[in-house]
């Protein structure tokens, strides 16, 4: 889905707007996640906390919150297409420690039919407040994200439009629908009608 890259993009987004973000590597399932997030933090010039061989993500988050001196904390947690009970419990524990203001579900534009089940499970574990749709630069239209929003009651907040740190845009529903319909500028079209 591009979850770790999206965490780096969010950090870059907030830094460019005058805030001091920090990244916490709490994905203890994917071996390369720690290194990837550390590199992204370096590229975005933001604080980073992680423990390369950690096994308990909620403990990593707890220690990271004490170590980082930032305005915005962004946690890269584990994620999989199918959410098993173990991962739901893990995410719930991280959520309890973090007590986040925002909890984003990151989904690729091409997710399709599994979006509903994934959104329900993540919402149950963390209380989704927003959806970030990645890979909008592909041929996929992102309809699954709309299903996820309908299921969780959350709104799309951002869209990822490429692989670079700056390739994150605030969601604009008019542009989103225009892209889905293959219309480059729906607003102008509506004005003509």
Identify the residue ranges that each predicted region occupies.
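P-loop/Walker A NTP-binding module and the surrounding RecA-like catalytic core of P-loop NTPases
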Residues: 1-192
């Amino acid at each position: 889905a591009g979850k770790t890259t999206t965490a780096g993009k969010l950090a870059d987004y907030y830094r460019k707007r005058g805030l001091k973000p920090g990244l916490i590597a709490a994905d203890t399932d994917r071996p390369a996640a720690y290194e990837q997030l550390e590199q992204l933090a370096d590229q975005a010039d933001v604080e980073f906390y992680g423990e390369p061989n950690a096994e308990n993500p909620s403990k990593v988050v707890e220690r990271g919150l004490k170590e980082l001196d930032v305005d915005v904390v962004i946690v890269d947690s584990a994620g999989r297409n199918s959410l098993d009970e173990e991962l739901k419990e893990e995410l719930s524990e991280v959520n309890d420690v973090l007590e986040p203001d925002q909890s984003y579900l990151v989904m690729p534009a091409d997710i399709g039919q599994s979006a509903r089940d994934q959104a329900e499970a993540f919402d149950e574990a963390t209380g989704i407040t927003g959806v970030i749709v990645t890979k909008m630069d592909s041929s996929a239209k992102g309809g699954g994200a709309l299903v996820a929003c309908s299921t969780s009651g959350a709104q799309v907040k951002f869209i990822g439009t490429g692989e670079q740190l700056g390739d994150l845009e605030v969601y604009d529903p008019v542009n989103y629908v225009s892209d889905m319909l293959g219309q480059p500028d729906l607003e102008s079209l509506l004005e003509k009608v």
